[in-house]
Amino acid sequence: MLIFLLKELFRHYIANGSSMYVTMLDASKAFDKVNHSKLFTKLIDRGCPSFIVRILYYWYRTQKFTVRWCCSFSEFFTVSNGVKQGGILSPHLFNVYMDDLSVNLNKLQIGCLYAGTIMNHMMYADDLCVFSPSVAGLRKLTDCCAKYGNMFDITYNAKKSVCMVIDNKPRDKKNIHPVVINNHTLPYTEKCKYLGHIINNNLTDDDDIARQKRCIYAQANALARKFYLCNNSIKTTLFNSYCGSMYTSSLWCHFKKQSLKGITVAYNNSFRIIHNLSPRCSASHMFATNYVKSFNERIRSSIFSLLCRLEKSDYILFVKYLHTFIYYQSPLIKHWIDQLYAFNS
Protein backbone atom coordinates (compact mmCIF):
# COMPACT_ATOMS: atom_id res chain seq x y z
CA MET A 1 0.00 0.00 0.00
CA LEU A 2 2.83 2.40 0.84
CA ILE A 3 4.66 1.66 -2.41
CA PHE A 4 1.39 2.11 -4.31
CA LEU A 5 0.86 5.58 -2.83
CA LEU A 6 4.47 6.57 -3.45
CA LYS A 7 4.42 5.57 -7.14
CA GLU A 8 1.03 7.19 -7.69
CA LEU A 9 2.40 10.44 -6.28
CA PHE A 10 5.40 10.29 -8.60
CA ARG A 11 3.22 9.51 -11.63
CA HIS A 12 0.91 12.42 -10.84
CA TYR A 13 3.77 14.93 -10.80
CA ILE A 14 5.41 13.54 -13.94
CA ALA A 15 2.06 13.68 -15.78
CA ASN A 16 1.84 17.37 -14.91
CA GLY A 17 5.33 18.11 -16.26
CA SER A 18 7.14 18.32 -12.92
CA SER A 19 10.18 16.43 -11.68
CA MET A 20 10.51 14.69 -8.34
CA TYR A 21 13.69 14.60 -6.27
CA VAL A 22 13.89 11.62 -3.92
CA THR A 23 16.28 10.46 -1.20
CA MET A 24 16.22 6.94 0.21
CA LEU A 25 17.85 7.04 3.64
CA ASP A 26 19.30 3.91 5.20
CA ALA A 27 19.39 3.95 9.00
CA SER A 28 22.17 1.67 10.19
CA LYS A 29 20.79 -0.85 12.73
CA ALA A 30 18.14 1.62 13.84
CA PHE A 31 16.32 -0.89 16.08
CA ASP A 32 19.56 -1.57 17.97
CA LYS A 33 20.29 2.12 18.60
CA VAL A 34 17.08 3.19 20.32
CA ASN A 35 18.14 5.01 23.49
CA HIS A 36 16.10 3.66 26.39
CA SER A 37 16.13 6.86 28.45
CA LYS A 38 14.99 8.99 25.52
CA LEU A 39 12.36 6.40 24.58
CA PHE A 40 10.83 6.38 28.07
CA THR A 41 10.87 10.19 28.11
CA LYS A 42 8.90 10.21 24.85
CA LEU A 43 6.38 7.75 26.30
CA ILE A 44 5.85 9.96 29.36
CA ASP A 45 5.48 13.09 27.20
CA ARG A 46 2.82 11.31 25.14
CA GLY A 47 0.75 10.60 28.24
CA CYS A 48 1.50 6.92 28.53
CA PRO A 49 0.36 5.57 31.95
CA SER A 50 3.22 5.65 34.42
CA PHE A 51 2.80 2.00 35.46
CA ILE A 52 3.33 0.87 31.84
CA VAL A 53 6.47 3.00 31.59
CA ARG A 54 7.76 1.49 34.86
CA ILE A 55 7.08 -2.04 33.58
CA LEU A 56 8.96 -1.32 30.35
CA TYR A 57 11.76 0.35 32.29
CA TYR A 58 12.13 -2.65 34.61
CA TRP A 59 11.89 -5.06 31.68
CA TYR A 60 14.66 -3.41 29.66
CA ARG A 61 16.91 -2.49 32.58
CA THR A 62 16.97 -5.95 34.18
CA GLN A 63 17.31 -8.07 31.05
CA LYS A 64 20.69 -9.74 30.59
CA PHE A 65 22.36 -11.21 27.53
CA THR A 66 25.05 -13.75 26.80
CA VAL A 67 26.97 -14.64 23.65
CA ARG A 68 27.24 -18.24 22.54
CA TRP A 69 30.34 -19.40 20.68
CA CYS A 70 30.18 -23.10 19.74
CA CYS A 71 29.62 -24.80 23.10
CA SER A 72 30.83 -21.98 25.34
CA PHE A 73 28.97 -18.93 26.66
CA SER A 74 30.20 -15.50 27.66
CA GLU A 75 29.42 -13.78 30.94
CA PHE A 76 26.04 -12.06 31.22
CA PHE A 77 25.90 -8.36 30.40
CA THR A 78 23.28 -5.61 30.12
CA VAL A 79 22.56 -3.17 27.29
CA SER A 80 21.23 0.39 27.39
CA ASN A 81 20.20 0.72 23.75
CA GLY A 82 17.92 -1.08 21.34
CA VAL A 83 14.51 -2.73 21.31
CA LYS A 84 14.06 -6.49 21.15
CA GLN A 85 14.17 -7.94 17.65
CA GLY A 86 10.96 -9.85 16.95
CA GLY A 87 9.19 -8.53 20.05
CA ILE A 88 5.48 -7.72 19.87
CA LEU A 89 5.97 -4.25 21.34
CA SER A 90 9.19 -3.44 19.49
CA PRO A 91 7.62 -1.98 16.29
CA HIS A 92 5.29 0.20 18.36
CA LEU A 93 8.10 1.44 20.59
CA PHE A 94 10.24 2.21 17.56
CA ASN A 95 7.35 4.13 15.95
CA VAL A 96 7.03 6.24 19.09
CA TYR A 97 10.77 6.87 19.02
CA MET A 98 10.72 8.02 15.37
CA ASP A 99 7.33 9.75 15.24
CA ASP A 100 8.74 13.15 16.17
CA LEU A 101 10.86 13.03 13.02
CA SER A 102 7.65 12.76 11.00
CA VAL A 103 6.22 15.71 12.93
CA ASN A 104 9.34 17.81 12.28
CA LEU A 105 9.26 17.04 8.56
CA ASN A 106 5.58 18.00 8.32
CA LYS A 107 6.26 21.30 10.10
CA LEU A 108 8.61 22.36 7.31
CA GLN A 109 5.62 22.62 4.92
CA ILE A 110 7.90 21.55 2.08
CA GLY A 111 6.93 18.82 -0.34
CA CYS A 112 4.20 17.77 -2.74
CA LEU A 113 0.53 18.67 -2.73
CA TYR A 114 -1.33 15.42 -3.26
CA ALA A 115 -5.05 14.80 -2.67
CA GLY A 116 -5.23 18.07 -0.74
CA THR A 117 -2.38 17.11 1.61
CA ILE A 118 1.26 18.23 1.67
CA MET A 119 3.47 15.15 1.64
CA ASN A 120 7.26 15.06 1.88
CA HIS A 121 8.16 11.68 3.35
CA MET A 122 7.08 8.08 3.81
CA MET A 123 8.35 5.94 6.62
CA TYR A 124 7.95 2.23 7.31
CA ALA A 125 9.91 1.17 10.40
CA ASP A 126 13.52 2.19 9.64
CA ASP A 127 12.99 2.63 5.87
CA LEU A 128 12.68 6.35 5.19
CA CYS A 129 11.99 8.08 1.88
CA VAL A 130 11.91 11.89 1.59
CA PHE A 131 10.92 13.72 -1.59
CA SER A 132 10.29 17.18 -2.96
CA PRO A 133 9.67 18.81 -6.37
CA SER A 134 12.87 20.86 -5.89
CA VAL A 135 16.45 20.08 -4.88
CA ALA A 136 16.43 22.90 -2.33
CA GLY A 137 13.41 21.37 -0.61
CA LEU A 138 15.01 17.93 -0.63
CA ARG A 139 18.18 19.27 0.99
CA LYS A 140 16.15 20.87 3.80
CA LEU A 141 14.28 17.61 4.39
CA THR A 142 17.53 15.64 4.46
CA ASP A 143 19.10 18.12 6.90
CA CYS A 144 16.08 17.74 9.17
CA CYS A 145 16.54 13.95 9.18
CA ALA A 146 20.25 14.31 9.93
CA LYS A 147 19.61 16.67 12.87
CA TYR A 148 17.03 14.33 14.36
CA GLY A 149 19.41 11.41 13.94
CA ASN A 150 22.18 13.25 15.78
CA MET A 151 19.81 14.11 18.64
CA PHE A 152 18.46 10.57 19.07
CA ASP A 153 21.45 8.38 18.15
CA ILE A 154 20.14 7.36 14.71
CA THR A 155 22.99 7.09 12.19
CA TYR A 156 22.22 7.29 8.49
CA ASN A 157 24.58 5.28 6.34
CA ALA A 158 25.71 7.60 3.54
CA LYS A 159 27.15 4.69 1.56
CA LYS A 160 23.77 2.95 1.31
CA SER A 161 21.61 6.08 1.05
CA VAL A 162 20.94 7.31 -2.50
CA CYS A 163 19.20 10.10 -4.38
CA MET A 164 17.13 9.83 -7.53
CA VAL A 165 15.43 12.18 -9.98
CA ILE A 166 12.02 10.93 -11.14
CA ASP A 167 11.44 12.38 -14.60
CA ASN A 168 10.67 11.39 -18.17
CA LYS A 169 13.51 13.56 -19.48
CA PRO A 170 17.15 12.39 -19.24
CA ARG A 171 19.19 14.64 -16.96
CA ASP A 172 22.90 15.19 -16.50
CA LYS A 173 23.72 14.30 -12.89
CA LYS A 174 26.61 16.78 -12.87
CA ASN A 175 24.19 19.69 -13.24
CA ILE A 176 22.07 18.66 -10.24
CA HIS A 177 22.92 20.20 -6.87
CA PRO A 178 24.33 17.57 -4.48
CA VAL A 179 22.52 16.40 -1.36
CA VAL A 180 24.77 16.08 1.69
CA ILE A 181 24.12 14.16 4.91
CA ASN A 182 26.65 13.93 7.75
CA ASN A 183 29.29 15.58 5.52
CA HIS A 184 28.87 12.90 2.84
CA THR A 185 27.51 13.60 -0.64
CA LEU A 186 24.79 11.16 -1.65
CA PRO A 187 25.08 9.65 -5.16
CA TYR A 188 22.34 9.96 -7.78
CA THR A 189 21.14 6.65 -9.22
CA GLU A 190 18.72 5.58 -11.94
CA LYS A 191 16.98 2.99 -9.77
CA CYS A 192 16.77 2.02 -6.14
CA LYS A 193 15.00 -0.52 -3.95
CA TYR A 194 12.42 0.61 -1.41
CA LEU A 195 10.66 -1.98 0.76
CA GLY A 196 11.86 -4.69 -1.61
CA HIS A 197 10.37 -3.03 -4.71
CA ILE A 198 12.67 -1.58 -7.38
CA ILE A 199 11.69 1.97 -8.36
CA ASN A 200 13.10 3.27 -11.64
CA ASN A 201 13.68 6.94 -12.41
CA ASN A 202 11.18 6.76 -15.31
CA LEU A 203 8.75 4.56 -13.31
CA THR A 204 9.00 1.57 -15.63
CA ASP A 205 8.57 -1.84 -14.02
CA ASP A 206 10.95 -3.97 -16.10
CA ASP A 207 13.64 -4.02 -13.40
CA ASP A 208 11.22 -5.12 -10.70
CA ILE A 209 9.80 -7.82 -12.99
CA ALA A 210 13.35 -9.08 -13.56
CA ARG A 211 13.89 -9.14 -9.77
CA GLN A 212 10.75 -11.20 -9.28
CA LYS A 213 11.74 -13.57 -12.09
CA ARG A 214 15.08 -14.26 -10.38
CA CYS A 215 13.27 -14.90 -7.09
CA ILE A 216 10.90 -17.39 -8.73
CA TYR A 217 13.74 -19.41 -10.23
CA ALA A 218 15.73 -19.32 -6.99
CA GLN A 219 12.75 -20.51 -4.92
CA ALA A 220 11.85 -23.23 -7.44
CA ASN A 221 15.37 -24.67 -7.53
CA ALA A 222 15.63 -24.62 -3.73
CA LEU A 223 12.26 -26.38 -3.33
CA ALA A 224 13.14 -28.96 -5.99
CA ARG A 225 16.36 -29.87 -4.15
CA LYS A 226 14.89 -30.06 -0.65
CA PHE A 227 11.47 -31.61 -1.30
CA TYR A 228 12.01 -33.88 -4.30
CA LEU A 229 10.72 -36.91 -2.33
CA CYS A 230 7.39 -35.27 -1.39
CA ASN A 231 4.14 -36.04 -3.17
CA ASN A 232 2.50 -33.72 -5.70
CA SER A 233 0.05 -32.26 -3.19
CA ILE A 234 2.83 -31.01 -0.92
CA LYS A 235 4.83 -29.72 -3.89
CA THR A 236 1.79 -27.79 -5.14
CA THR A 237 1.29 -26.25 -1.71
CA LEU A 238 4.94 -25.20 -1.59
CA PHE A 239 4.69 -23.75 -5.09
CA ASN A 240 1.66 -21.66 -4.14
CA SER A 241 3.38 -20.40 -0.99
CA TYR A 242 6.83 -19.57 -2.34
CA CYS A 243 6.46 -19.03 -6.10
CA GLY A 244 2.84 -17.97 -6.39
CA SER A 245 2.93 -14.97 -4.06
CA MET A 246 4.63 -12.46 -6.36
CA TYR A 247 5.45 -9.38 -4.31
CA THR A 248 4.10 -6.06 -5.71
CA SER A 249 3.01 -7.73 -8.96
CA SER A 250 -0.21 -5.72 -8.81
CA LEU A 251 1.79 -2.50 -9.24
CA TRP A 252 3.22 -3.43 -12.65
CA CYS A 253 1.68 -1.35 -15.43
CA HIS A 254 4.59 0.12 -17.46
CA PHE A 255 6.70 -2.68 -18.89
CA LYS A 256 7.83 -4.28 -22.11
CA LYS A 257 5.99 -7.29 -23.48
CA GLN A 258 9.26 -9.20 -23.42
CA SER A 259 9.58 -8.67 -19.65
CA LEU A 260 6.08 -9.96 -18.99
CA LYS A 261 6.65 -12.93 -21.29
CA GLY A 262 9.89 -13.73 -19.46
CA ILE A 263 8.28 -13.87 -16.02
CA THR A 264 5.35 -15.89 -17.40
CA VAL A 265 7.81 -18.47 -18.70
CA ALA A 266 9.63 -18.42 -15.34
CA TYR A 267 6.35 -19.01 -13.50
CA ASN A 268 5.47 -21.97 -15.73
CA ASN A 269 8.98 -23.44 -15.61
CA SER A 270 9.13 -23.18 -11.82
CA PHE A 271 6.09 -25.44 -11.56
CA ARG A 272 7.72 -27.91 -13.94
CA ILE A 273 10.98 -27.82 -11.97
CA ILE A 274 9.30 -28.51 -8.63
CA HIS A 275 7.13 -31.31 -10.02
CA ASN A 276 9.92 -32.70 -12.24
CA LEU A 277 7.80 -32.36 -15.38
CA SER A 278 8.91 -32.23 -18.99
CA PRO A 279 9.75 -28.73 -20.33
CA ARG A 280 7.38 -29.40 -23.23
CA CYS A 281 4.30 -30.27 -21.19
CA SER A 282 1.28 -27.99 -21.59
CA ALA A 283 1.16 -25.20 -19.00
CA SER A 284 -2.63 -24.90 -19.05
CA HIS A 285 -3.03 -28.67 -18.64
CA MET A 286 -0.63 -28.99 -15.70
CA PHE A 287 -2.22 -26.03 -13.89
CA ALA A 288 -5.77 -27.31 -14.47
CA THR A 289 -4.85 -30.83 -13.38
CA ASN A 290 -3.32 -29.63 -10.10
CA TYR A 291 -5.91 -26.88 -9.45
CA VAL A 292 -3.30 -24.12 -9.59
CA LYS A 293 -3.85 -20.59 -10.88
CA SER A 294 -2.10 -19.58 -14.08
CA PHE A 295 0.16 -16.53 -14.19
CA ASN A 296 -2.58 -14.23 -15.51
CA GLU A 297 -4.97 -15.46 -12.84
CA ARG A 298 -2.34 -14.70 -10.19
CA ILE A 299 -1.97 -11.16 -11.48
CA ARG A 300 -5.73 -10.57 -11.54
CA SER A 301 -6.08 -11.98 -8.02
CA SER A 302 -3.36 -9.71 -6.64
CA ILE A 303 -4.89 -6.68 -8.38
CA PHE A 304 -8.34 -7.45 -6.99
CA SER A 305 -6.92 -8.00 -3.51
CA LEU A 306 -5.06 -4.67 -3.50
CA LEU A 307 -8.09 -2.84 -4.92
CA CYS A 308 -10.31 -4.22 -2.14
CA ARG A 309 -7.78 -3.23 0.53
CA LEU A 310 -7.54 0.23 -0.98
CA GLU A 311 -11.31 0.79 -0.99
CA LYS A 312 -11.75 -0.59 2.54
CA SER A 313 -8.85 1.35 4.03
CA ASP A 314 -9.70 4.08 6.54
CA TYR A 315 -6.30 5.79 6.18
CA ILE A 316 -7.02 9.43 5.44
CA LEU A 317 -4.70 9.70 2.43
CA PHE A 318 -6.31 6.70 0.72
CA VAL A 319 -9.80 8.04 1.46
CA LYS A 320 -8.90 11.39 -0.10
CA TYR A 321 -7.22 9.67 -3.03
CA LEU A 322 -10.35 7.67 -3.87
CA HIS A 323 -12.45 10.86 -4.00
CA THR A 324 -10.21 12.90 -6.30
CA PHE A 325 -9.80 13.02 -10.07
CA ILE A 326 -6.28 11.60 -9.62
CA TYR A 327 -7.79 8.18 -8.97
CA TYR A 328 -9.72 8.13 -12.24
CA GLN A 329 -6.83 9.50 -14.31
CA SER A 330 -4.24 7.09 -12.92
CA PRO A 331 -2.58 4.82 -15.54
CA LEU A 332 -2.34 2.10 -12.90
CA ILE A 333 -6.08 2.17 -12.21
CA LYS A 334 -6.79 2.01 -15.95
CA HIS A 335 -4.44 -0.96 -16.20
CA TRP A 336 -6.28 -2.66 -13.35
CA ILE A 337 -9.62 -2.19 -15.10
CA ASP A 338 -8.22 -3.65 -18.32
CA GLN A 339 -6.87 -6.66 -16.44
CA LEU A 340 -9.98 -7.32 -14.38
CA TYR A 341 -12.63 -6.81 -17.03
CA ALA A 342 -10.89 -7.76 -20.30
CA PHE A 343 -10.42 -11.54 -20.47
CA ASN A 344 -8.22 -11.74 -23.52
CA SER A 345 -5.63 -14.08 -22.00
Task: List the predicted regions and their residue ranges.
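Charged boundary/loop elements
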Residues: 1-45, 136, 159, 249, ...
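Conserved pre-catalytic core of RNA-dependent polymerases
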Residues: 1-96
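Mobile genetic element proteins and their domesticated derivatives, centered on retroelements
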Residues: 6, 26, 43, 56, ...
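Conserved, non-catalytic sequence blocks in retroelement Pol enzymes and Pol-derived host proteins
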Residues: 12-16, 28-32, 45, 82-91, ...
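Catalytic palm subdomain of template-directed nucleic-acid polymerases
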Residues: 29-46, 121-150, 168, 201-204
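Short, conserved micro-motifs composed of acidic
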Residues: 71, 155-190
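Active-site palm subdomain of RNA-directed nucleic acid polymerases
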Residues: 93-125, 129-131
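Non-catalytic, peripheral interaction segments enriched in hydrophobic/basic residues
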Residues: 125-126, 157-162, 166-168, 191-311
